[in-house]
């Protein structure tokens, strides 16, 4: 009996370790390869021996990053991502408010459509958007570019934000809103003092997801981008090997992501400790 339990625990632990390895091993390889230097053509060098004994003649991938002509695609991606966030999040919040006050059948229908949009393949969404722009935007002798990219990103980002914000809004105690209005607060003041602080964690999560999805998107962007270049389109345009600067840029993004996760974890820990201290003070005062 004891051996059977030990075997089950070992299998569970092994499965957990295998999953972690499959998730994080590619990221570790990217970080290691970024220190290998680069070839004469600026491509990556897949020789892990160079990590411990780097070739002094090999140019660092991070130096290639400074020489690469990706500043404009990076700026374009950041601008597109920020505008997408600025437009998508308010639309999702207003939609969530409308769903909260709507009838149940309409509520389920709209939320189901949002979930269906998330399950739709990107290539289908991209083709449908191209057909839409071909019969509207292009018919006015306008070109594919920033407008079509941003419009497309907003169209697939709003469902992400809605799915993250609406479940949190459903749990909001409406008595708090009624009490705020009884105290003389206007609906706008109630929103900023009651609703917004309550929804803030979900809104921040939605902002991160929307920006990351917009920044990373290639399939839809490639169909509606016209002559505008983004980081994703630049990375997918490689034909003769992966450039070293791309690996260096990926390593920087990995480190930034790790730092962001650590900051969020630290913030949650500090909030938890603060609540514990308040509880102790209340217990002592009572």
From Swiss-Prot:
Topology of the protein relative to the lipid bilayer: Multi-pass membrane protein
Record-linked CDD domains: TM_PBP2 (cd06261)
Subcellular location: Cell membrane
Matches recorded under InterPro entries: Bact_Polyamine_Transport, MetI-like, MetI-like_sf
ABC transmembrane type-1 domain sequence ranges: 74-264
This protein's UniProt keywords: Cell membrane, Membrane, Transmembrane, Transmembrane helix, Transport
TM segment ranges: 15-35, 78-98, 113-133, 145-165, 191-211, 244-264
Summary of the function given for this chain in its UniProt record: Required for the activity of the bacterial transport system of putrescine and spermidine.
Record-stated family: Belongs to the binding-protein-dependent transport system permease family. CysTW subfamily.
Protein name: Spermidine/putrescine transport system permease protein PotC homolog
Classification lineage: Bacteria, Bacillati, Mycoplasmatota, Mycoplasmoidales, Mycoplasmoidaceae
């Amino acid at each position: 009996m004891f051996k059977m339990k030990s075997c089950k625990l070992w299998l569970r632990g092994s499965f957990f370790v295998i999953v972690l390895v499959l998730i994080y091993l590619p990221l570790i390889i990217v970080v290691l390869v970024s220190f290998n230097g680069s070839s004469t053509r600026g491509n990556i060098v897949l020789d892990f021996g160079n990590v411990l004994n780097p070739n002094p003649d090999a140019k660092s991938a991070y130096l290639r990053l400074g020489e690469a002509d990706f500043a404009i695609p990076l700026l374009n991606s950041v601008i597109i991502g920020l505008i997408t966030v600025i437009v998508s999040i308010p639309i999702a919040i207003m939609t969530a408010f409308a769903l909260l006050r709507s009838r149940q059948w309409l509520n389920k229908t709209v939320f189901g459509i949002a979930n269906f949009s998330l399950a739709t393949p990107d290539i289908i969404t991209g083709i449908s958007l191209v057909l839409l722009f071909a019969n509207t935007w292009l018919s006015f002798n306008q070109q594919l570019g920033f407008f079509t990219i941003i419009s497309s990103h907003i169209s697939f980002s709003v469902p992400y934000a809605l799915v993250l914000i609406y479940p949190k809004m459903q749990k909001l105690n409406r008595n708090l809103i009624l009490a705020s209005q009884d105290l003389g607060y206007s609906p706008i003041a109630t929103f900023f003092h009651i609703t917004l602080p309550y929804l803030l964690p979900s809104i921040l999560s939605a902002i991160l997801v929307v920006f990351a999805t917009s920044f990373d998107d290639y399939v839809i962007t490639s169909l509606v981008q016209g002559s505008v270049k983004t980081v994703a389109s630049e990375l997918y345009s490689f034909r003769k090997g992966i450039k070293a600067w791309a690996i260096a840029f990926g390593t920087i993004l990995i480190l930034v992501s790790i730092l962001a996760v650590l900051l969020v974890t630290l913030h949650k820990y500090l909030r938890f400790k603060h609540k514990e201290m308040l509880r102790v003070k209340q217990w002592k005062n009572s």
